[in-house]
UniProtKB/Swiss-Prot annotation:
Pfam families linked to this entry: DUF496
Keyword Cell inner membrane: no
Species: Photobacterium profundum (strain SS9)
Record protein name field: Pole-localizer protein TmaR
Keywords, in A-Z order: Coiled coil, Cytoplasm
GO cellular component: cytosol
Length: 101
C-alpha cells in the first residue's frame, strides 16, 4: 500500500513539475518577445521624430500584433476541431473493435 501511495505522490509531483516548467518556458518566451518588440521599436524611432510620428508607429505595430493574435486564435480553433474529430474517430474505432471481439 505504501508503494502505491508513494507512486501516486511521485506521479503527482512529476506532473506538477511539468506544468511549472511549461509555465516558466512560456514566461521566458513572452519576455523574449517583449525585448524583441522594444528592439524593433528602437529601430524605427529617430531623434528628429515628432510624438505623433512615434505614436503612429506604435499604433501600426499594435495593429500588426492584434492581427497575428487573431490568426493564432483561428488556427487554434481549427486544431481543436480536428482534435475533437480525431478523438471521436478513435472512440468509434475502439467501440467497433470491442463489438468485433
Amino acid at each position: 500500500m505504501n508503494n502505491i501511495l508513494e507512486l501516486v505522490r511521485q506521479t503527482r509531483r512529476k506532473n506538477k513539475l511539468k506544468r511549472e516548467i511549461l509555465d516558466n518556458d512560456r514566461k521566458i518566451r513572452d519576455n523574449r518577445k517583449r525585448v524583441e518588440l522594444l528592439e524593433n521599436l528602437l529601430d524605427y524611432i529617430r531623434p528628429d521624430m515628432s510624438q505623433e510620428a512615434i505614436l503612429e508607429i506604435v499604433e501600426n505595430m499594435k495593429g500588426d500584433y492584434e492581427d497575428r493574435v487573431d490568426d493564432h486564435i483561428i488556427v487554434s480553433a481549427e486544431l481543436s476541431k480536428e482534435r475533437r474529430e480525431v478523438s471521436k474517430n478513435v472512440k468509434d474505432l475502439k467501440k467497433a473493435e470491442i463489438a468485433h471481439k
